[in-house]
Amino acid sequence: MHTTYLKNLIGFESLTPQSNGAIEYIDDLLKEHGFKTEVKIFGETEQVTNLYAVYGNSKPNICFVGHVDVVPAGDPNLWHNSNPFKAHEQEGKIYGRGTVDMKGSIACFLAASLDFIKNNTDFVGSISFLLTSDEEGKAKHGTKEMLQYIYNQGHEIDFAIVGEPTCEKEIGDTIKIGRRGSINFKLAVKGLGGHVAYPQKANNPLPCLIRILNELTNIKLDKGTEFFQNSNLEVTNIDVDNNTTNVIPETATVHFNIRFNNLHSAETLAKQVEEIIKQHCQKHKLDYTLEYNSSADSFIQNPNDKIKEFATIVEKTLNIKPNFSTSGGTSDARFVKNYCPLVEFGLLSDTAHKINEYTKISDLQKLYDVYYNFLMETLNVTGSPPLLGMT
């Protein structure tokens, strides 16, 4: 059923932050199978659809956390079937926007959960879903707000699986147990514009900005840690609002981002960056404005018993020993970690957000097997049959 669920989910053009029927489809499906569900819409200008659904009323509560929203698909004519929101199956692969990020893992956990409930009437615990349509965008009214809401209603999650596409070369090779932080900067260096023939009557902000960027981009922020790669600064945009060649610009603006590990905080990095900017601007007798905001702090979890148990299930099911990692961008795991231990585990990441995003059907089966086996091991099923995928 995981392939059917995935094909159905791809059919919803759920561009962030819209559900466009995807969450409603899942809500109806889970209600049909005995889940207690609640759909909440948060936000005023951009309304975000969220779902919490739970089966069972005892502990532990194993929760799948995910998002149905997707990024734009680009030119549809570049896709195999000219329609990125109609699932296309070819040579053992399923193509469509959101296939790996992350409708495929949603489909696998749906199938695993419903099959588990059907096959095991004596299990102890609860299975739940927390889904949003606001992860790829601002992420203000999605998982973060829904977690606050369900905890205020008395719900508690004991362990979460976030279904982001984490694997690198084969299903099972990577489990995320943390993420780098992210901080965005906008720097405007303010000079005095004028004619290029009379530089003595102007103060060009660009030489100062170039020196600032040269120092910032050559800083070795750290050497990384056991689970984190080194922190990294990337310049993303430079603008002087000047298309002519004979005018010295008034202002030079740059945007840059730092992805940082747990050796730093957003505050310490902002202070370090501003000290460098201030020194150069004072030397060139220029003013500046600096804006920054952090969308996520870095975090790392010590692999506890439940995280290790999940890794053991992956290894037993797929005969591959997973690596613990913190690589990649930010995810909603940064909100979940404030409430319970978690792992991020899903499909391969290499086609996420790309034209002709796809997954192998065989990879869907592997992911389904891991999810199903974890439920079998965790929810105290007595006299259970051998785990899926094992001989």
From Swiss-Prot:
Zn(2+) 1 binds at H67, D101, E164. The keyword Acetylation does not apply. The active site is at D69, E135 (proton acceptor). It catalyses: N-succinyl-(2S,6S)-2,6-diaminopimelate + H2O = (2S,6S)-2,6-diaminopimelate + succinate. Pfam families: M20_dimer (PF07687), Peptidase_M20 (PF01546). Catalyzes the hydrolysis of N-succinyl-L,L-diaminopimelic acid (SDAP), forming succinate and LL-2,6-diaminopimelate (DAP), an intermediate involved in the bacterial biosynthesis of lysine and meso-diaminopimelic acid, an essential component of bacterial cell walls. Homodimer. This is Succinyl-diaminopimelate desuccinylase. It comes from Rickettsia bellii (strain OSU 85-389). The lineage of its organism: Bacteria, Pseudomonadati, Pseudomonadota, Alphaproteobacteria, Rickettsiales. The gene is dapE.
